A protein has these predicted regions:
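A cross-kingdom C-terminal cell-surface attachment/processing module
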Residues: 582-603
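C-terminal low-complexity, Ser/Thr- and acidic/Pro-rich disordered "stalk" regions positioned immediately N-terminal
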Residues: 561-578
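Beta-sheet-rich non-transmembrane sensory/scaffold domains
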Residues: 27-565
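Bacterial N-terminal signal peptides
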Residues: 11-22, 590
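Bacterial N-terminal signal peptides that target proteins for export
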Residues: 1-12, 582-584
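Short hydrophobic alpha-helical membrane-anchoring segments
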Residues: 18-26, 598-599, 603
Length: 606
């Protein structure tokens, strides 16, 4: 279909960009309510770049744990005073593996997923995968247990009751090595594809593992049935048991079920934790952008939001869940991810796809040949691309999505992320930080020279996510890995999310010419997000912890605003026990009514 332009370019430019693109004014661009935001209290610096990936929090000790893959350790940080986070100790994982990927905490027990490097045959260079481990330790960093899991443990999660730990074993393909370490061998026939796994570790009431993990695989699933349903199984020569790559874990409120993203497969796995067994795998489908807005090119020289008949493959990274009126919903950050190895790659620019026999319209085919339109947009030669091509696909959905637990979309904000940033952050729109620069401040400054650089790929790239309950309301906090910053949505109604705020202190500081000394102002590439409820918080106020991969910083935010104040006030009013005076009962009931009435009025006004 012909793109419909809904944007008007102007000469407005804010910030210190050396490459000034025109600001984009969207007639119906989303505007946040302004009643909820994030206030940075303090930032922990991991001691160098690339030293903060995933963050966890333990309410019992008021300590957070930050995975540091660069140094293969977990930093335990005291945040009893969030304005002054203090390193307690660093837990070295080198004795147990070669890289720490995920970390979780519950009731004084911490666990990290640690991968082990593969070995390579000296004659052929063929790789043999080595399963990783889950390392248990306490708030002082004392290691208690090391439990074997699957290959390449990634996300780690506790069940809410603390009796299970679930570990996603990604089991990524391994190309053979050329010259024993001199690079990847291009021959796909020499590659190996380890099994993807989900490990379930049972714990006693003190958080001590009972024994070995139940390492679950996908052998019971029929590969062709899954493919027919839309699950992307396509590594040459692999079936479901090897091809599926568990990425991120969330566990239901009743601790009975785990939901695990299978990012490259664009699917969700469902795990019965009581059995335990993987009971289902369902495909997520694609997102139609024909009536949404996106910039599809990094070569058009401007912010150019248009709608195209392109489908986004959700391919979520992080996932969380929440329950409303007894119904569980999943919330995903739709990053998108391709397989791109020396021995196999599915990546292709739309201009380079083979359109022989294609049923696409002449206008769309012409757009794919133009680098300023669709030609630069990254796509796939694998599923769901057909031969001949009848539909165009791109990585990710540039959004978050709320799903029912049978795979139906309940809510997605469409193109609101991209529309809002185009209008309010035009000098950093779809920017990319130069990760080869020596300081976080220089990386942030480089984004002003890299405007539009990610438009041909995944846009702002939503990757991290957490859901939190504050009073009677639920909020989603979504981290944009490339664009930076956190999107905040009220998702109390799972079918109708409300945009509350976008917080990007690093870009705000750069635009203002600041020195990046205040908390949160030198964060680059947010990866992990953790919500801390008011009841668990050392300040008795809800917090959001955000770990930033490139800058190596982790910032502690307080969730603030008029709506939050009203919710906390309403939820803190407790009616006196039976036998109290009628006057006190009337007073307490009145306070509760006033608080709720004020909250309702604010919501209606918004």
């Amino acid at each position: 279909m012909r793109p419909t332009h809904r944007n008007v370019a102007s000469a407005v430019a804010i910030g210190l960009s050396s490459l000034l693109l025109p600001a984009t004014v969207i007639a119906d661009a989303p505007e946040p309510s302004g009643s909820v935001t994030l206030t940075a209290l303090g930032t922990y610096d991991g001691g160098g770049l690339a030293r903060a990936e995933i963050v966890a929090f333990d309410a019992r000790s008021a300590r957070m744990a930050v995975s540091n893959d660069d140094l293969n350790r977990v930093d335990i940080v005291d945040i009893s005073d969030p304005t002054s986070p203090t390193l307690v100790t660093s837990v070295d994982m080198s004795e147990h593996g070669d890289g720490v990927n995920g970390v979780a905490a519950h009731n004084g027990v911490f666990v990290a997923g640690v991968e082990r490097d593969p070995s390579y045959d000296e004659a052929t260079g063929v790789a043999t995968a080595d399963p990783g481990v889950a390392v248990f330790f306490d708030a002082d960093g004392e290691i208690s247990d090391v439990i074997g899991v699957g290959v390449l443990p990634d996300s780690v999660g506790f069940s809410p009751d603390g009796r299970k730990v679930v570990v996603a074993g990604e089991g990524e393909p391994l190309c053979a090595t050329a010259d024993l370490g001199g690079g990847e061998e291009e021959d796909i026939a020499l590659a190996t594809d380890p099994a993807g796994t989900i490990a379930v570790i049972s714990l006693n009431e003190d958080g001590v593992p009972h024994g070995v993990a139940d390492v679950l695989g996908f052998d019971a699933f029929d590969t062709e049935v899954l493919r027919a349903s839309g699950v992307r199984i396509f590594w040459p020569g692999s079936d479901a048991s090897n091809d599926l790559e568990p990425e991120y874990v969330t566990v239901s409120a009743d601790s009975s079920t785990a939901y695990v993203t299978l990012q490259e497969a664009n699917a969700i796995a469902v795990v019965n934790l009581d059995t335990p067994e993987i009971t289902d795998v369902w495909a997520l489908g694609t997102k139609d952008f024909s009536n949404l807005l996106m910039d599809a090119s990094n070569r058009d020289g401007e912010i150019n939001l248009e709608n195209w008949d392109v489908r986004g493959i959700y391919m979520p990274d992080a996932v969380d869940n929440y329950t409303v009126n007894g119904v569980t919903y999943l919330v995903t950050a739709n990053e998108g991810d391709s397989r791109d190895y020396d021995c196999y790659s599915e990546e292709e620019r739309m201009a380079d796809l083979d359109y022989t026999g294609s049923t696409l319209s002449a206008e769309i085919l012409a757009a794919t040949a133009d680098d300023a339109l669709l030609g630069r947009l990254n796509s796939t030669t694998a599923m769901p691309t057909s031969d001949p091509i009848d539909q165009l696909y791109m990585w990710g959905a540039r959004s978050f999505t709320i799903w029912t637990t049978d795979g139906e979309v309940a809510y997605d904000p469409g193109s609101e992320f991209e529309e809002y940033i185009a209008e309010h952050y035009p000098n950093y729109f779809n920017a990319n930080a130069d990760d080869e620069l020596p300081t976080a401040e220089e990386m942030i400054a480089s984004m002003a020279d890299e405007v539009d650089a990610r438009s041909d790929d995944k846009g702002g790239e939503p990757e991290g996510l957490a859901v939190g309950r504050i009073g009677s309301r639920y909020y989603a906090f979504v981290a944009l890995e490339r664009q930076g910053g956190i999107m905040v949505y009220d998702i109390t109604d799972p079918t109708n999310g409300q945009f509350e705020a976008y917080v990007n202190l690093a870009l705000d500081e750069h635009a203002a010419g600041g020195d990046h000394s205040a908390p949160g102002t030198k964060d680059v590439s947010p990866e992990g997000v953790k919500f801390v409820s008011a009841s668990d918080s050392p300040t008795s106020k809800p917090l959001v912890l955000v770990s930033n991969e490139l800058s190596g910083t982790t910032t502690i935010y307080e969730v603030t605003g008029s709506e939050i104040d009203a919710e906390l006030t309403a939820s803190s009013v407790t009616l006196p026990a039976t036998g109290s005076s009628p006057q006190l009962l009337v007073l307490a009931s009145g306070l509760l009514a006033v608080g709720l009435a004020g909250l309702i009025a604010r919501r209606r006004a918004a």
